[in-house]
Regions:
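Asparagine-centered strand-capping/turn motif at beta-strand->loop junctions
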Residues: 394-398
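Intrinsically disordered, low-complexity Pro/Gly/Ser/Thr-rich segments with frequent PxxP/GP/PP motifs
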Residues: 416-441
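Membrane-embedded alpha-helical bundles of multi-pass integral membrane proteins
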Residues: 2-248, 254-256, 305, 318-350
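Cysteine-centered iron-sulfur cluster-binding motifs in ferredoxin-type domains/subunits
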Residues: 111-126, 217-233, 264-312
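Short, solvent-exposed loop/turn segments enriched in Ser/Thr/Gly
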Residues: 385-390, 431, 445-450
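Hydrophobic alpha-helical transmembrane segments in integral membrane proteins
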Residues: 354-377
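Short acidic, flexible loop segments centered on an aromatic residue
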Residues: 399-413
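Terminal connector regions
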Residues: 439-473
Length: 473
């Protein structure tokens, strides 16, 4: 009996050489620490600008007032989402679902086009990690100095500097926890209650929870999150193709690697442009050697590009040995920017954005729902009318007190028992019990479809809700 055999194929990148491999060989061990060297250059400036933008946006939004309320507040307790002058309720949360879909397809589009630039430039894990590394460098020294210090005995001076570092780290973490919870609880009141010891248990719990998570992720786990725990790192390859922009090493130009003096001619020595300085590995936050080829751990941060460009400039060589490029370009072929996968993601993204704005335009500044009395289908009142009882729930989504008029269509000579003009406070859900009465002889059927109508005082909008009027069969 014959057995089918699966062919084994060597998929090791052509540029990988065990003898010259400089990557962190134990980077898959969570206990192994990567000492990231500082890198300076064009792409690192862009990263800093992007990081500062994200930090300022995240930190300032909960402090922005709008009228008497916080501009953006996801009030879970009251089931409201305040977005500047608009208040959204659970029935409007299709908007939130559309936002998530837009964010997802936006990420798919960017990843297919530019690779993992989100990870390298704007991902909160990356931004907070590099902010923590900045404090670490200022208080403990460069990567080489930190590595040497950690391998020696702890001194009093080093212990003090490490203590200051952890105080700075936890201060940032605590501010992050406050800010995040401030999107769900009014920020000013949260801070006042916390520092006057008047806060409730759950807000304090969540502030400390997110503070500890931030401290652990950015201070200790760092690239472990990117390598082992982030699902995006695993499924990103499904969106990559050979025209996706990646951080790539030009092996045709760089090999054979080797040290040399600045005045030496590399061609006479049989060498490529790579001087094997190892800086591209030392500045990599995930500890990989980009010269070994494309690896899923690469977050497209460009740190190795800046490090290599600085080295090429010092040597008098052309920059771009490591650069943002594509697999097709590295193999000497042309890159196709417009391709079916990218156009497909872009088309879906535009459709979702269009649907979102259509949905926003259709959101009414008020809402109404109608509940029939479940205990009694109908009753005959003293006037001989068939009477049905309802509860109207009217929501004022605006920021001002509103006056509404109520009416009904579908019944002739109907009697309205209850208020027909109501005032509703901002954000209030008003429960209005009322009844309708009608002459049974003027009803054509046992069940009549009716429309409750809500209009504002200036007749700028009308809301219609369908219900039923029932008489004796």
């Amino acid at each position: 009996m014959s057995q089918d055999k699966i062919d084994i194929k060597d998929v090791t990148p052509k540029t990988f050489n065990p003898k010259t491999h400089k990557g962190n060989g134990d980077r898959f061990n969570p206990s192994n620490r990567i000492y990231v060297r500082e890198s300076k250059g064009t792409f690192q400036k862009l990263r800093r600008y992007g990081g500062w933008f994200l930090l300022l946006f995240f930190a300032l939004i909960p402090w922005i007032p709008y009228g008497e309320r916080q501009a953006i507040l996801l009030d879970i307790g009251n089931q409201q989402f305040n977005f500047f002058g608009t208040t959204l309720y659970p029935q409007d949360l299709t908007l939130l679902a559309l936002l998530f879909v837009i964010a997802a397809f936006g990420l798919f589009f960017i990843t297919t086009f530019l690779g993992r630039v989100w990870c390298g430039y704007l991902c909160p894990q990356t931004v907070w990690t590099f902010m923590y590394i900045w404090f670490e460098e200022k208080l403990e020294g460069s990567a080489n100095k930190r590595r040497k210090q950690d391998s020696n005995k702890l001194t009093a001076n080093l212990a003090m500097r490490k203590a200051l570092k952890h105080i700075a780290w936890f201060s940032i973490a605590l501010a992050t926890g406050f800010t995040f919870v401030g999107y769900f609880v009014p920020m000013k009141q949260l801070v006042i209650d916390f520092f006057t010891f008047n806060a409730n248990f759950w807000p304090v719990f969540w502030v400390m929870f997110f503070a500890i998570c931030t401290y652990g992720n950015a201070g200790w786990m760092r690239s472990i999150m990117c390598i082992h725990m982030c699902p995006y790192a695993r499924f990103q390859s499904a969106m990559f193709d050979k025209d996706t922009f990646i951080v790539g090493y030009d092996s045709k130009r760089g090999e054979k690697r080797g040290p040399r003096s600045r005045k030496a001619d590399p061609k006479q020595l049989g060498l490529g442009d790579c001087i094997d300085c190892d800086l591209c590995v030392q500045v990599c936050p995930t500890g990989i050697d980009i010269r070994d080829g494309l690896q899923y751990e690469c977050i497209n941060c460009g740190a190795c590009i800046d490090a290599c460009d600085n080295t090429m400039e010092r040597m008098g060589y052309e920059k771009g040995l490591i650069n943002y490029t594509t697999e097709h370009r590295l193999s000497g072929k042309s890159t196709k920017v417009m391709r079916p996968k990218l156009l497909g993601y872009g088309a879906v993204l535009l459709v979702m954005i269009g649907l979102f704005f259509l949905q926003v335009a259709s959101v009414d500044p008020a809402g109404m729902s109608v509940l029939r009395d479940r205990n009694q289908l109908f009753r005959v009142n003293s006037s001989g009318e068939v009477e049905n009882t309802y509860t109207l729930k009217v929501i004022n989504k605006s920021q001002q007190v509103q006056e509404y008029n109520l009416n009904v269509e579908g019944l002739s000579d109907v009697s309205w028992y209850g208020k027909q003009t109501i005032q509703v406070e901002p954000g209030e859900v008003l429960n209005l019990p009322m009844s309708l009465g009608a002459d049974p002889d003027k009803l054509d059927s046992a069940i009549t479809t009716i429309q409750f109508i809500l209009t504002d005082k200036s007749n700028e909008f009308t809301i219609e809700v369908e219900s039923r009027f029932i008489k004796k069969l």
